[in-house]
């Protein structure tokens, strides 16, 4: 049980509640609870590719990776267990779609850490779900309610749009830099001498903004965009299409599904796992980069200045350089 997150631990206090239910798990699930959960039937939808990879050997066809679950996946379930994410817009997006697939009186359970903002769930869903707090423990809350009426879900209305010079950007809720180009990415883009050439990997690409802008400036590059999140990948595909750019989009847990080498790997890596600071992704990105770079290839990363990139880069490459910086961010580069 120690490997389970606090929201999953609070759910386990109510296992009898689910024994005869057909359950679909969705939302910000961050552990393997569905593999050991006691219910009549268990299905899982996840936007996270690494969760799909871990759970699919056990759940087979009863787990689905994608932006949203299919009607077929939810068709034989009668109960929703939704893990509240830290992004309210993402929660609303996913729950609105989920609720649109179920008949009225469907049972909805919502669980999450208090600091994630789960307290807003009751008001956010008031029109469609009558929620009440069922339990509170481990700084988490569990809400329960029944679907009162199905919402009307419109996928097209979920997209957010902005422009970076002549590049059009589209993003789905929950994807990094949803409303504007973030400061770190701006600094990273400013560090490049255009035009670029060769094979380029935009790793943990988010909406693919970095790769899309660089490909627009240097159309001769052979671009690959990768991310672990389905909404990020869908946003990347949309941005490539709207800007008429050809590139490959790959679901991958860092390098898990990327066997080849590149002339340049670039990234603005996240350093949070859910609500907690976690640099394991950063460590893995740097440690495994040499296996994915040609000789003379470069790893270029932007990061908050306080993160331990110098130590990590020195440990793997034996050297690094700071190409540019401001008060908050630094752009690092290491060459194989």
From Swiss-Prot:
GO cellular component term, pick one: cytoplasm
One Pfam match, given by its short name, reads: MTS_N
Q: What is this protein called?
A: Ribosomal RNA small subunit methyltransferase C
On whether Methyltransferase is a keyword of this UniProt record, the answer is yes
Q: Which reaction does it catalyse?
A: guanosine(1207) in 16S rRNA + S-adenosyl-L-methionine = N(2)-methylguanosine(1207) in 16S rRNA + S-adenosyl-L-homocysteine + H(+)
Q: CDD domains given for it?
A: AdoMet_MTases
Q: Lineage of this protein's species?
A: Bacteria, Pseudomonadati, Pseudomonadota, Gammaproteobacteria, Enterobacterales
Key words of the record: Cytoplasm, Methyltransferase, rRNA processing, S-adenosyl-L-methionine, Transferase
């Amino acid at each position: 049980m120690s490997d389970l997150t606090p929201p999953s631990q609070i759910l386990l206090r109510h296992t009898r509640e689910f024994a005869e239910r057909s359950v679909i798990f969705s939302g910000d699930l961050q552990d393997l609870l569905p593999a050991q959960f006691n219910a009549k039937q268990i299905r899982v939808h996840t936007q996270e590719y690494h969760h799909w990879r871990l759970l699919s050997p056990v759940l087979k066809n009863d787990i689905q990776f994608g932006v949203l679950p299919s009607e077929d996946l939810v068709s034989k379930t009668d109960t929703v267990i939704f893990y509240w994410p830290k992004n309210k817009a993402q929660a609303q997006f996913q729950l609105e779609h989920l609720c649109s697939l179920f008949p009225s009186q469907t049972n909805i359970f919502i669980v999450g850490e208090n600091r994630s903002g789960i307290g807003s769930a009751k008001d956010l869903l008031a029109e469609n779900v009558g929620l009440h707090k069922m339990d509170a423990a481990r700084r988490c809350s569990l809400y329960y309610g029944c679907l009162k009426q199905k919402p009307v879900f419109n996928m097209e209305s979920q997209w957010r749009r902005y422009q970076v010079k002549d590049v059009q950007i589209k993003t789905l809720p929950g994807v990094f830099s949803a409303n504007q180009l973030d400061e770190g990415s701006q600094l990273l883009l400013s560090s490049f001498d255009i035009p670029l050439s060769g094979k380029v990997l935009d790793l943990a690409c988010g909406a693919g903004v970095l790769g899309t802008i660089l490909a627009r400036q240097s159309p001769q590059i052979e671009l690959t965009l990768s991310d672990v999140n389905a909404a990020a990948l869908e946003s990347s595909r949309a941005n490539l299409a709207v800007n008429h750019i050809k590139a490959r989009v790959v679901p991958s847990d860092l390098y898990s599904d990327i066997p080849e080498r590149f002339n340049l790997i670039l990234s603005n890596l996240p350093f949070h796992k859910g609500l907690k600071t976690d640099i394991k992704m950063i460590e893995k990105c740097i440690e495994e980069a040499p296996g994915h770079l040609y000789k003379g290839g470069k790893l270029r990363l932007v990061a908050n200045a306080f993160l331990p990139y110098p130590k990590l880069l020195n440990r793997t490459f034996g050297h690094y350089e700071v190409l540019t910086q401001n008060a908050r961010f630094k752009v690092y580069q290491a060459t194989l």
